[in-house]
Amino acid sequence: MRHGTLRVDVVTIFPEYLEPLNVSLVGKARARGQLNVHVHDLREWTYDRHNTVDDTPYGGGPGMVMKTEPWGDALDSVLADGYETDAHGPALIVPTPSGRPFTQELAVELSERPWLVFTPARYEGIDRRVIDEYATRMPVYEVSIGDYVLAGGEAAVLVITEAVARLLPGVLGNAESHRDDSFAPGAMANLLEGPVYTKPPAWRDREIPEVLLSGHHGRIARWRRDEALKRTTANRPDLIERCDPSAFDKKDREMLSILGWFPDPDGVPHGRFWRRPEAMEE
């Protein structure tokens, strides 16, 4: 677990897009000094009267590419403030649909770093030489928040920052709150969180599951685990397929069997450990 304040720097041509970082849990974390966010306008490092940050791509093609000079000068300026080259220095986060998937596991990894610098791009992206240059100085994470394309990377910055910030010590009111999150490391790795309920116990003729009123912690834990398995098999079967059988106990395997999932020895070399009966017949 990390200690101290997490520093976040964001270089963007739309600083106002980052306003949501002033509200909710992230805003409170900033007010308490757990999160130190600096947003920088990339155009402050342009030197022509049009504040140009993009140009046509070499090799032709549609769209524009963000220029090396503004990005290089901006990052040099940001990094000059407290820059270190060891593990305690910054990591560069490049939001891009061509990056590695952003996962809860990666959020945990980033939450243990002291300093994150984001480069949300627009247009067709940033000239590749910028990324390659800073990769020689610090860890670079090219990260995608999904298999779709946005107009720019600022929305991804908001997503990643919130996912990371809520993992910082003291940000959540209850330190155990994220233990049972979907994808949380440990027992919930590769599983989606099941349904949750609160008062009143009955609403419009719909009652909460009786087990939740039983006070029996073991039965409640088993029910929650079964509901997580049900939801994951229904909504994200790909997650179940690649779960190592050793991650499941006897009761987990019984529930998976009821749901129509069985070990798939033939799939192990391909990273697939489970299959549904209909898939096994194909």
From Swiss-Prot:
Keywords: Cytoplasm, Methyltransferase, S-adenosyl-L-methionine, Transferase, tRNA processing. Its main location: cytoplasm. S-adenosyl-L-methionine binds at residues 145-150. GO terms for molecular function: tRNA (guanine(37)-N1)-methyltransferase activity. It catalyses: guanosine(37) in tRNA + S-adenosyl-L-methionine = N(1)-methylguanosine(37) in tRNA + S-adenosyl-L-homocysteine + H(+). It comes from the Bacteria. One of its GO terms (cellular component) is cytosol. The keyword Cell membrane does not apply. It is found in: Cytoplasm. Its EC number is 2.1.1.228. InterPro entries: Alpha/beta_knot_MTases, tRNA_m1G_MeTrfase_C_sf, tRNA_m1G_MeTrfase_TrmD, tRNA_m1G_MTases_N, tRNA_MeTrfase_TRMD/TRM10. It is an enzyme of class 2 (transferase). GO terms for biological process: tRNA N1-guanine methylation. Belongs to the RNA methyltransferase TrmD family. NCBIfam families: PRK00026.1, trmD. HAMAP family: TrmD (MF_00605). This is tRNA (guanine-N(1)-)-methyltransferase. It comes from Streptomyces avermitilis (strain ATCC 31267 / DSM 46492 / JCM 5070 / NBRC 14893 / NCIMB 12804 / NRRL 8165 / MA-4680). The gene is trmD.
